[in-house]
């Protein structure tokens, strides 16, 4: 029995696969660099000691300054921040996959796809909009 799979489903799956693969490679490489103590933003030994602290105190103790939401991306040259970025990249994979099939969607499906993309994007940037600091 053959099952027909729509072109948009294949496109969605390919985009998810490529973004997931790229994100996981980025995560594994940056995590390995961090564990090997190659230019970390937060020293690995200090993370264990201070992990229980609220986010604002954690950043003050480990970095010496307050950090706002997503401000670790300003220090993207450090492998531990690249690991955080790779998680953000992985979280956006469905957004890019949905955007890739949007031209093929028609009627109510197009509207629903736009709503899902908007919800995912709002969830990603909500801390920036609301000024939260991750606590």
From Swiss-Prot:
It is found in: Cell membrane. GO terms for cellular component: plasma membrane. Its main location: membrane. The chain crosses the membrane at residues 13-35, 82-101, 108-130. It is a multi-pass membrane protein. Keywords: Cell membrane, Membrane, Transmembrane, Transmembrane helix. This is Uncharacterized protein AF_0123.
């Amino acid at each position: 029995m053959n099952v027909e799979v729509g072109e948009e489903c294949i496109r969605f799956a390919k985009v998810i696969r490529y973004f997931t693969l790229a994100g996981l490679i980025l995560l594994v490489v940056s995590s390995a660099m961090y564990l090997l103590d190659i230019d970390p933003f937060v020293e690995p030994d200090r993370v264990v000691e201070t992990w229980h602290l609220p986010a604002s105190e954690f950043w003050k103790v480990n970095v010496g300054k307050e950090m706002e939401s997503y401000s670790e991306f300003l220090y993207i040259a450090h492998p531990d921040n690249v690991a955080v970025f790779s998680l953000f990249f992985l979280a956006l994979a469905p957004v890019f996959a949905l955007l890739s099939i949007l031209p093929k969607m028609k009627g109510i499906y197009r509207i629903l796809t736009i709503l899902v993309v908007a919800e995912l994007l709002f969830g990603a940037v909500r801390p920036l909009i609301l000024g939260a600091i991750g606590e």
